[in-house]
């Protein structure tokens, strides 16, 4: 059935839709399936299934219903682009407080339309949120400023937070795990649970929490510096998340503000993120995106992009989210992914298709991880243009030939090297831990700094 007369209006102007402030705008790359309708017909069916319509006319439709139709307002068939305007009245709101929910946004904009028989593929690349809808989202309650404050740094441009993930990701019992934390904290700032770590039979949750709390106290006493830990509280059950969070805060007591809560936001979903955001508003909310590549990967033509995921995370209230390594680590990505970091940290930023004003909503910190080490960092910082972020290097710290503490120091020295604009090989001559990173990661060293062996003369540990 051709629904383009109802669900498409190419006379609508994007500037007027934005000025009107009553529509969420979404940009998709879409391909119709052969043997069905043409591009505009398929786009209109997509808009219908995403809002008030179905594949047939129904007798219950009235004039009010037609007034909240989603409308295709722009198409570029040559580039497979379609843009759809969704009236904000379509989106579900909480009964308890009238707030918006990402679950509803996803259900409409990326729900049934992903399985339509006449669509070969469709993927969301950007979306725009008008002020009237933006203000209904929680946004972050804490930011990197709160971590900088705990670390005793300035809350403006407080700088690089040196972090790690304890490796191996699974298989350590509570005390060996805590010992690894202590070792890293002698040189670094921030440790996170790897996303599968929780309450395994060989590492009971409460035993691990107690051991890490003791390691933090000892590391702080030894170094005279504050330390940070991000605990995974992800669970299927809302009450389990609350129980984990409350036990952690009770155990860390005076160090409770040194604790972030990690939630696997993609696999556990918006409900888990919002549970943590609302139940623990004083804690830094660490959004881990494990599993996201199933839909965000450039190889996937359905779903949405990592840019869209990160933008949604800011709306939900994530204090920080993993944003990949922009092509400098082991995960998929490219240098242009820095647009993700800009969108979640700035008060106004341009996406692939839309300009977004955040109207003072707190920023979300880029958390960089995935195959990073000290040698890759100067180029990464060059690409991004600043170092006000958290980096969690697992292998990059514990793969250092001199251990976790030296690995942490090498990461910090890498940022110092970049800030000074120094040649990394020359800088390494006076910074032992950074120099030993060349020996720790020789394949990276050979690729990035081909002359390093002659200048640094590798030595046995």
Swiss-Prot record:
The keyword Transmembrane helix does not apply. Mg(2+) binds at residues 192, 194-195. It comes from the Bacteria. It is an enzyme of class 4 (lyase). It comes from Rhodopseudomonas palustris (strain ATCC BAA-98 / CGA009). This is Ribulose bisphosphate carboxylase. Gene3D superfamilies: Ribulose bisphosphate carboxylase, large subunit, C-terminal domain, RuBisCO large subunit, N-terminal domain. RuBisCO catalyzes two reactions: the carboxylation of D-ribulose 1,5-bisphosphate, the primary event in carbon dioxide fixation, as well as the oxidative fragmentation of the pentose substrate. Both reactions occur simultaneously and in competition at the same active site. PROSITE patterns: RUBISCO_LARGE.
